[in-house]
Amino acid sequence: EAGRSSVERLYVGSTFCSQYFLRQPRRVWREAFALCRRLGVPATLVVPVFSQKDLAAGCERIDRLVYGFGDVVDEITVNDVGMLAFCVERYGCSVNAGRLFSKEPRDPRYVRLFEERHTVAIPALLTEVFRRGEVRGIEIDPTHAALDLAPLSGLMPHIQVGVHVP
């Protein structure tokens, strides 16, 4: 909160590590959602990609968090197709495609690649899911100096794009 005039939303969970997500003590989850209540802000549950061995435990944890803290969790960010289908079908809240959902190429060894304008696109397999409006937002990394979002806007005029910056 330091240096910010206001907080609009709290992102709770993990983009990258399923073990971090699964091993987080209940106290930490309760404190995070209590902070949301105190500040009067909603929470986004950020869900990592689970391995097959952790999938059942991951789904169970998501159930407990969404149903147990549904008064503040109004959005879920997922990072793979399977979890997208699971969350869209099971929960009545907004679903976002996370940063790992559609990784863009980037490599710091190729400066020219970063300096180019890059068109952000969705794989053809997923365009119908996005077109139907089941995904409300997409998160991307600043992989290039300029990102062209026109194809996304044309495909999904309702979409909200979040760019993660350092």
Name each model-derived stretch.
Residues E1-P166:
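Active-site pocket-lining/capping segments in soluble small-molecule metabolic enzymes
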